[in-house]
């Protein structure tokens, strides 16, 4: 009888321990998926594909660009900007310093990263370094989508001066 109680206790304890580990594995899997999506989110540029771009953004995504006029809400506003940007030839993104913050449910993440961007446009080579990129992605109907993306380029000086 004591051996049976011991066996039931050990079996129960093992079940509890393994069931607690499921969420961590699921969250680790979601984190890997999110990281892969973030790292591939600019593939539509490389492939010059408007269709891929539309599949990358949610229909109600917000894009905040480096130009003062670039505060775009929803795919209908984002699309013309993307069409213009797809004229860029041979785009290459070199990213670094990626930080990802996952939601507890593993269905949403925010991220920050820095990137360098090289390209050709009209036969002229171009390069932009140290672009700060952040955003939020969400799993919608089983697919990761950009729901918000923000681009900025640091300039010397502060818009509002303060000590730090």
Residue ranges and their predicted role:
Residues 1-7:
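Positively charged n-region of N-terminal signal peptides that target proteins for export
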Residues 7-17:
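Sec-dependent N-terminal signal peptides
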Residues 20-51, 55-56, 160-164:
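Short, low-complexity N-terminal intrinsically disordered segments enriched in polar/charged residues
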Residues 41, 53-54, 61, 74, ...:
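Hydrophobic pocket/interface hotspot
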Residues 62-73, 86-90, 104:
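A short gly/proline-enriched turn/hairpin at secondary-structure junctions
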Residues 67, 104, 113-117, 135, ...:
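A mature extracytoplasmic/lumenal domain signature
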Residues 79-123:
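Surface-exposed, charged secondary-structure patches
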Residues 130-158:
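Short beta-strand edge/turn micro-motifs at domain boundaries
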